[in-house]
């Protein structure tokens, strides 16, 4: 019998019976009561009964004299259909209302994984699209675009591309606007990036923000593909993982999907309830089809604890039956962080910068060149001091922001 394993962290009083609570969860989310059932009913329902797989009691103290224990429960896959909404409703539906239970991991069976597409492109496919195989990718972000028209957006796009970035993404709060319509951003963006490629020989891809009502998204994404869009930025947690999966599975779309973590903080930030960062921004994003997953880095302006950030990274890149998702540590990234980013996340991640590019004293071109310069220095084992002597853009960036050293 195929089973799904769900692991929870329970926050509780020292004298609370954790094993009993685990049994209540296993039964309450499957067959309900058990001891009061007649034998015939038990035989009929046995294949639907949840069971406690493992309990690790009091592995960590919590605040206010409370403790935390870890519980793993096995759920028969016969209980739910092969989709993420059914899984989450079963293993964490009403249980999420408890307030002292955090879902930290899900282990899917090989049979169930066949219903989850994973990334269409993944790390390997994205690298083929960019033509970059030997370093982290560099991404920049449109900034201050609310209320601006296409003239301003085109100029921002051009300057960022001339700085040598590999990706440029829309701001996640840029929605459909008569000043900068979705389709115009794609068409005009393609023209600008074609021009910069012809000028520099460097290819930059543009991730346009897919927005609108849920039932409009598929048609808009298909239109984006028809117009030759490079990739889609998607606020997955405003819409739902299943919506992203449906976009990833559509053969008429076939565009890389960049999953933004907006809204996820409401689901992950508490140590006592919600989801773990690694599960939501890592594993579930990956299984639902995210080619790139953005998350706060451990060093920037909205820093995650290292354990959580590295947990997301591992969930994105560990070997599995689906392709790997490109991890994108973000928020407050500047050139002085690059050596630490590359030490901690290796080559297979995307360095994502907004203010670290636009806030450069020489503008977005200087910001991009500063990032590219320090990335190259780390790749080739050059000293940062020597590199700053030969690159004024990097020197200006480090004078402004300094270096993060561990």
Curated annotation (Swiss-Prot):
Substrate binds at residues 143, 169-172, 260, 332, 354-355. The active site is at residue 94. PROSITE patterns: RUBISCO_LARGE (PS00157). Binds 1 Mg(2+) ion per subunit. This is 2,3-diketo-5-methylthiopentyl-1-phosphate enolase. Catalyzes the enolization of 2,3-diketo-5-methylthiopentyl-1-phosphate (DK-MTP-1-P) into 2-hydroxy-3-keto-5-methylthiopentenyl-1-phosphate (HK-MTPenyl-1-P). Belongs to the RuBisCO large chain family. Type IV subfamily. SUPFAM superfamilies: RuBisCo, C-terminal domain (SSF51649), RuBisCO, large subunit, small (N-terminal) domain (SSF54966). Pfam families: RuBisCO_large (PF00016), RuBisCO_large_N (PF02788). GO terms for molecular function: 2,3-diketo-5-methylthiopentyl-1-phosphate enolase activity; magnesium ion binding; ribulose-bisphosphate carboxylase activity. Mg(2+) binds at residues 169, 171-172. It comes from the Bacteria. Its cofactor is Mg(2+). The keyword Endoplasmic reticulum does not apply. Coiled coil: none annotated. It is an enzyme of class 5 (isomerase). Homodimer. It catalyses: 5-methylsulfanyl-2,3-dioxopentyl phosphate = 2-hydroxy-5-methylsulfanyl-3-oxopent-1-enyl phosphate.
């Amino acid at each position: 019998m195929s089973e799904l394993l769900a692991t929870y962290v329970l926050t509780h009083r020292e004298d609370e019976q954790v094993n009993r609570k685990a049994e209540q969860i296993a039964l309450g989310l499957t067959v309900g009561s058990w001891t009061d059932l007649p034998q015939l009913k038990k035989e009929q329902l046995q294949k639907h009964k949840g069971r406690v797989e493992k309990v690790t009691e009091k592995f960590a103290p919590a605040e206010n004299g409370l403790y935390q224990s870890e519980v793993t429960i096995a759920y028969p896959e016969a209980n739910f259909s092969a989709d993420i909404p059914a899984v989450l409703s079963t293993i964490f539906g009403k249980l999420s209302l408890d307030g002292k239970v955090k879902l930290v991991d899900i282990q899917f069976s090989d049979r169930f994984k066949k219903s989850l597409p994973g990334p269409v492109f993944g790390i390997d496919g994205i690298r083929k699209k960019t033509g970059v195989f030997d370093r982290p990718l560099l991404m920049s972000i449109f900034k201050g675009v609310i209320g601006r028209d296409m003239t301003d957006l085109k100029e921002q796009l051009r300057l960022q591309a001339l700085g040598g970035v590999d990706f440029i993404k829309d701001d996640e709060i840029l929605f459909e606007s008569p000043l900068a319509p979705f389709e115009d951003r794609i068409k005009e963006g393609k023209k600008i990036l074609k021009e910069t490629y012809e000028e520099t020989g460097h290819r930059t891809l543009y991730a346009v923000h897919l927005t609108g009502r849920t039932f409009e998204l598929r048609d808009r994404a298909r239109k984006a593909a028809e117009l030759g869009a490079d990739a889609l930025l998607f606020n997955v947690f405003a819409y739902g993982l299943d919506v992203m999966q449906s976009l990833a599975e559509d053969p008429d779309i076939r565009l890389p999907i960049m999953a933004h973590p907006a809204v996820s903080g409401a689901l992950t930030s508490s140590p006592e309830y919600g989801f773990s960062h690694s599960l939501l921004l890592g594993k579930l994003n990956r299984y639902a089809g995210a080619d790139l997953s953005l998350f706060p880095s451990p060093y920037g302006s909205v820093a995650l604890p290292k354990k959580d950030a590295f947990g997301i990274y591992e969930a994105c890149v560990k070997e599995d039956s689906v392709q790997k998702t490109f991890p994108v540590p973000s928020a407050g990234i500047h050139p002085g962080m690059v050596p630490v980013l590359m030490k901690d996340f290796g080559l297979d991640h995307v360095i994502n910068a907004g203010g670290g590019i636009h806030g450069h004293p020489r503008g977005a071109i200087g910001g991009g060149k500063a990032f590219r310069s320090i990335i190259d220095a780390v790749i080739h084992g050059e000293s940062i001091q020597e590199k700053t002597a030969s690159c004024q853009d990097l020197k200006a960036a480090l004078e402004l922001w300094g270096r993060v050293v561990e």
